[in-house]
Design a protein with these regions (language model features):
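Catalytic Tyr-x(3-8)-Lys segment
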Residues: 186-207
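Rossmann-fold cofactor-recognition segment
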Residues: 47-62
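Substrate-binding pocket helix/loop in short-chain dehydrogenase/reductase
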Residues: 88-89, 93-101, 189, 193
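N-terminal Rossmann NAD(P)H-binding glycine-rich loop of SDR-like oxidoreductase domains
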Residues: 12, 20
Length: 235
């Protein structure tokens, strides 16, 4: 059996690490990137011999270029890495609104560009947006950024064909990101989400990773967005 190589930005934690586990467990190799050297080394120790990693700043094109410089041929790319804040429109906070696009939209845009030399006809790219694209609850810059990523997936699918490009749009997910927040903040957010999602609970990182893996593996899907959100966008 021939095993493939995948690159994951944000592969040292959360959904990215969950996908890396799934790929290495079936014998594929992964190149993971993350901001924290400590988290990166912990992830590499867990993933074992099929994993390699580099620190990377996804908001810096030169850092992205260095990350992909010796990546070699890639069967797929997943780009969930982002760190950002959201804000209300009436606040008029340009720095927060623009930094959100820099961290989440442009980072994925340029990641695909810098990965191009390693992509081939049967490669797949999975971007990551968020369910607020289809059902905003305020924070319009955040909603617009997620919608822009879904549009980017469609545009890239056309321009980069036969490379497949799709987008994973998760809802609130029980992850390290949320578990590191104060318990009262986390529980309040989860309760609110539970009242909106049809399945009445946040998602799990393994569920999101399984969806990303499906998009990487299914050669008949391109230019699509899958909402792994427990039916949130239907309410």
């Amino acid at each position: 059996m021939t095993h493939a190589r995948y690159a994951i930005l944000g592969g040292s934690s959360g959904i990215g690490l969950a996908l890396a586990r799934k790929l290495t467990s079936r014998g594929d190799s992964v190149l993971i990137g993350g901001r924290s050297e400590e988290k990166l080394q912990a992830a590499l120790a867990e993933l074992g011999k099929h994993a390699a990693g580099k620190t990377v700043d996804v908001t810096d094109r030169l850092s992205l270029r260095a990350f992909f410089s010796d990546a070699g041929p890639l069967a797929g790319l997943f780009t969930p890495a982002a760190s950002y804040q959201t804000g209300d429109f009436r606040d008029g906070d340009a720095a927060t609104s623009e930094a959100l696009f820099q961290a989440k939209f442009w980072s994925q845009y340029w990641a695909v560009y810098e990965a191009l030399p390693g992509l081939h006809a049967s490669s797949a790219v999975v971007l990551m947006s968020g369910a607020a694209s289809a059902r905003p609850i305020g924070a319009p810059a955040y909603a617009a950024c997620n919608a822009a990523l879904e549009g980017l997936a469609r545009g890239l699918a056309v321009e980069l064909k036969p490379v497949r490009v799709n987008c994973l749009s998760p809802g609130t997910t029980d992850s390290e990101l949320w578990r590191n927040r104060p318990a009262d903040v986390r529980e309040s957010a989860y309760q609110y989400w539970n009242s909106l999602a049809l399945n009445g609970r946040p998602g799990h990182v393994d569920e999101q990773a399984a969806t990303a893996l499906f998009l990487l593996d299914n050669h008949n899907i391109t230019g699509s967005t899958i909402y792994c959100d427990g039916g949130y966008t239907l309410r």
